[in-house]
């Protein structure tokens, strides 16, 4: 037996009032970003492609999958940031049925690239761009008018899984992955400024029962991510060549997320229902070696969600999702050499810490309708959703999305 699948997507959107970031994929590349004090609204276009193939023979299964993302983020007014991203992930997996379990293993590889620049059309409005290095620090030698750079990176990962072959039993998952991203300054013959390293481990162990009209699952999870950053020591230039004479590991970041998660589902005449929830502990600690800077926060959180699905006819189905969550701060701390910091950097760091230690409440809702063309495997769908986030610092965030698509 064999099967193939694929998907294609396009997204366009807008982010309002973005400051202290002129690079795309902030969550991935932070703190090694390009930044300025002015910022503004940014527009984004994203193209996604995904496809795979799997074959099964007896107790053995083999599959391969490719995921590609191309993204363009830009601003139409000064400072005119632009980021162009290509991101390719390849996955290979195999599984074998042995005893009462299916044992699986997978390999993953990723290649990432981004070109990033900032331009000014009004000469009188030019402001400096900072090559940020973490917790309010900058690579001052290459900040100012050096506004064109690019990122190259990627990595690899391995995962192991065990799942019961029958409807009831224990299951487990483990994953290790490593990635690194190099920031290079295109203005100066692509000299590498910094390199960011990711090391991550994920472990999950649980029990489930999926038989009959009731489904129950409960698992415990631990996610650990260690990030570290090297700053290159760059010598004097010779014929536009900048030698690397050393490096220092200056930035360190440790993230922990551990939680218990549960699911309960059932079917009835009014449709299929599912409730899910989790409670957990989240911790984030950042450190810059010298001059010493620290920022940390820890939170306890809970989330409760629900889903309802029903077929309204042979060709129309409706799905409704809702969820609520709260993150409450339990500890926080900051150490900064404020006497030696620029006023604008002080304001940025204080603002960041203010929201790092804040408590957050979240609500989300989504409704989706699927329509299958009569006598065909082709379907159409429409989806409308939104997220509302409020925090204890009296600020809030809204996210709305609308999706239209074809399934086949």
What label would you give each PLM region?
Residues 142-277:
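Long, internal scaffold/assembly segments composed of regular secondary structure
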